[in-house]
Amino acid sequence: MDLQELINHPEASIVDVRTPGEFNEGHLEGTVNIPLDQVEERLDEFKKFSTPLILCCRSGMRSGRAAEFLKAQGLSDVYNGGGWTDVRLLKQ
């Protein structure tokens, strides 16, 4: 599956790891905000999301770090969606 197919998967969850301030300035409807600095302490929440789990941020750097951390914790169906505006363009 390519990224667009993953984002539009009926069971996909999208998590934005930007700060709450950045999130409030604009975000994709239906996206959950869990800032990067809270990913580790909120690991149990990530385990409850339906998959595929798509992570996004401003440019893809923070979401990439979060995705690598989650994969290292045993979550397998996790993807770095890149910047939230890119995810928005791919969402149908």
Q: Predicted segments — roles?
A:
Residues 56:
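Short, surface-exposed ligand- or partner-binding patches at beta-edge/loop junctions that are enriched
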Residues 1-13, 17-51, 61-92:
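Rhodanese-like catalytic fold shared by cysteine-dependent sulfurtransferases
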